[in-house]
């Protein structure tokens, strides 16, 4: 009986150890591929795809294969790009609080494996997008190349415009979604691209203000590091103001959507202007960052809901 009890206890401990090991592996994998970025970009990818189906008069259920290949391929291309970004930035990530525990910094994942993971993911993701349209695959590759070479390897460590350059790749996902259904030019994916492109600069500049000293320690020339908070706040307000006219190019989604989008834009702009009166710049930056996250989610969900009225 004693031996049997010991065996059961050993098995229980072994099971707990296995589960803990799986959780650890998943945590490391999620960190390397930046799972949060992947998930948020899939929201915009899906919205682009959904709107294309809506405007083209195509049924969702009849195109489930397109939905699958688009989301699967996009997820892999984005995850692969983020993996290579981690590989390249492993020397500076150690200086930042939010990145110093990444597996590429701690050494829990071999750098070469992370690089190959990224290459394989981008390759398989591109092949998946090819199952939809060639245009979608090309757009996905443009996003990956822009993120890896123009942003990570070139502008990030050299110019304060790195945020703007990085916004190009971040604006690509909804265009992938649209072109997977309709590869021809249309104003809607252009507007989606512009919304994402413009949104990212105030979003990441607010983050840069919050993490200013970390970026300074890492030697990354973010705008608040080089030109200070006052200049950064002015830039943020200008970029947010540029969002104001864009929803009106999506007037076919209806008045309720235009109302929601306009209120979101006006609210963000008002909060931005309030920053010139606030004395606590870091607190304001935190508010702006949180607002930007909610803004994007609400806006893109509202686009989908608008097609269901």
UniProtKB/Swiss-Prot annotation:
<feature type="transmembrane region" description="Helical">
    <location>
        <begin position="135"/>
        <end position="155"/>
    </location>
</feature>
<protein>
    <recommendedName>
        <fullName>Protoheme IX farnesyltransferase</fullName>
        <ecNumber>2.5.1.141</ecNumber>
    </recommendedName>
</protein>
<feature type="transmembrane region" description="Helical">
    <location>
        <begin position="114"/>
        <end position="134"/>
    </location>
</feature>
<dbReference type="InterPro" id="IPR030470">
    <property type="entry name" value="UbiA_prenylTrfase_CS"/>
</dbReference>
<feature type="transmembrane region" description="Helical">
    <location>
        <begin position="35"/>
        <end position="55"/>
    </location>
</feature>
<dbReference type="InterPro" id="IPR044878">
    <property type="entry name" value="UbiA_sf"/>
</dbReference>
<dbReference type="GO" id="GO:0048034">
    <property type="term" value="P:heme O biosynthetic process"/>
</dbReference>
<feature type="transmembrane region" description="Helical">
    <location>
        <begin position="236"/>
        <end position="256"/>
    </location>
</feature>
<dbReference type="GO" id="GO:0005886">
    <property type="term" value="C:plasma membrane"/>
</dbReference>
<keyword id="KW-0812">Transmembrane</keyword>
<feature type="transmembrane region" description="Helical">
    <location>
        <begin position="187"/>
        <end position="207"/>
    </location>
</feature>
<feature type="transmembrane region" description="Helical">
    <location>
        <begin position="161"/>
        <end position="181"/>
    </location>
</feature>
<dbReference type="GO" id="GO:0008495">
    <property type="term" value="F:protoheme IX farnesyltransferase activity"/>
</dbReference>
<feature type="transmembrane region" description="Helical">
    <location>
        <begin position="257"/>
        <end position="277"/>
    </location>
</feature>
<keyword id="KW-0350">Heme biosynthesis</keyword>
<comment type="pathway">
    <text>Porphyrin-containing compound metabolism; heme O biosynthesis; heme O from protoheme: step 1/1.</text>
</comment>
<feature type="transmembrane region" description="Helical">
    <location>
        <begin position="289"/>
        <end position="309"/>
    </location>
</feature>
<keyword id="KW-1133">Transmembrane helix</keyword>
<comment type="function">
    <text>Converts heme B (protoheme IX) to heme O by substitution of the vinyl group on carbon 2 of heme B porphyrin ring with a hydroxyethyl farnesyl side group.</text>
</comment>
<feature type="transmembrane region" description="Helical">
    <location>
        <begin position="64"/>
        <end position="84"/>
    </location>
</feature>
<dbReference type="InterPro" id="IPR006369">
    <property type="entry name" value="Protohaem_IX_farnesylTrfase"/>
</dbReference>
<dbReference type="InterPro" id="IPR000537">
    <property type="entry name" value="UbiA_prenyltransferase"/>
</dbReference>
<keyword id="KW-0472">Membrane</keyword>
<keyword id="KW-1003">Cell membrane</keyword>
<dbReference type="Pfam" id="PF01040">
    <property type="entry name" value="UbiA"/>
</dbReference>
<comment type="similarity">
    <text>Belongs to the UbiA prenyltransferase family. Protoheme IX farnesyltransferase subfamily.</text>
</comment>
<comment type="subunit">
    <text>Interacts with CtaA.</text>
</comment>
<keyword id="KW-0808">Transferase</keyword>
